[in-house]
UniProtKB/Swiss-Prot annotation:
A molecular function GO annotation: 5S rRNA binding
Domain of life: Bacteria
Gene name tied to this protein: rplY
Family: Belongs to the bacterial ribosomal protein bL25 family.
Keyword Mitochondrion in record: no
Source species of the chain: Actinobacillus pleuropneumoniae serotype 5b (strain L20)
Keywords: Ribonucleoprotein, Ribosomal protein, RNA-binding, rRNA-binding
GO cellular component: cytosolic large ribosomal subunit
Species lineage: Bacteria, Pseudomonadati, Pseudomonadota, Gammaproteobacteria, Pasteurellales
Protein name: Large ribosomal subunit protein bL25
Primary role: This is one of the proteins that binds to the 5S RNA in the ribosome where it forms part of the central protuberance.
Length: 95
């Protein structure tokens, strides 16, 4: 099973900006590692939440398309809301 997500580069940083994203059905994330600089991104919450229900999401290499460029990543960390079935933030590491 392969996973491919479309992402936008995230320009607004901070707690307020993150809360606005989550309120609009999006989830903030970051891609880091490798020889490139870290990139803050925005993903669609429902697509990622549905994908993370599969065990393969945590073990396989994922593809994230950011500004027309494909990044090969693995999930490094996921932060979840303590009481709601919501994702709060994701960390991806380049492969």
């Amino acid at each position: 099973m392969s996973f491919k997500f479309e992402a936008e580069v995230r320009s607004a940083q901070g707690k307020g900006a993150s809360r606005r994203l989550r309120h609009n059905g999006q989830v903030p994330a970051i891609i880091y590692g490798g020889n490139a600089e870290p990139v803050s991104i925005i993903l669609d919450h429902d697509k990622v939440n549905n994908a993370q229900a599969h065990d393969a999401f945590y073990n396989e290499v994922l593809t994230i398309v950011v500004a027309g460029k494909e990044e090969q990543v693995k999930v490094q960390a996921i932060q979840r809301h303590p009481t709601k079935p919501k994702l709060v933030h994701l960390d991806f590491k380049r492969v």
